[in-house]
């Protein structure tokens, strides 16, 4: 398993602790650019860490869990019969949005007055590179998704969002560096996937109901003890919603 954007290895710890058969003779490679975050990742048998995804030769699965929505993207605005790039300018010591050069949209979509769309070339390039790194296996992407056409019909602040201290922030140009900027992923701008599904269906197909039932039984039997197994059982129930 190769996890891109693994951070401190929270997901890696959970996956390895579950003891999946696919890792009995394999390794969980945590890919994280930040040296600070890599320093907090788990180590030992079953774990490996790197700043980069291997160029090729991977047999297994590459996982991107809420990675693509954080990659750099462009923003296009409809202006008459064309699309134009949205840039950032300075006006009276304030950062403002400025319509700049004409741009071709990433997919074939007509400009409609007031419409805006993302240009997610970085996400498309990352996905292509991840697929090319696989000799045998699959790429699993988990993210908030939409389509370019669908986003063009919605207010931009519904799919281009900012967060500060785990709460929704202000405009993307407000207080640079103080808030995270995230965007829904337009799946029609990525290489065509083999299949897509929503998170609920994916979890049910892969046995979430059985795992929750097992956790509920563990919690019922060991709640009075309050040991780690009991806490894990309760966590399954709570996190499954």
Regions found by a protein language model. Name each.
Residues 104-241:
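Long, Lys/Arg- and hydrophobic-enriched amphipathic alpha-helices
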Residues 6, 67, 142-146:
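Short, well-ordered beta-to-alpha junction loops that form the rim of enzyme active sites
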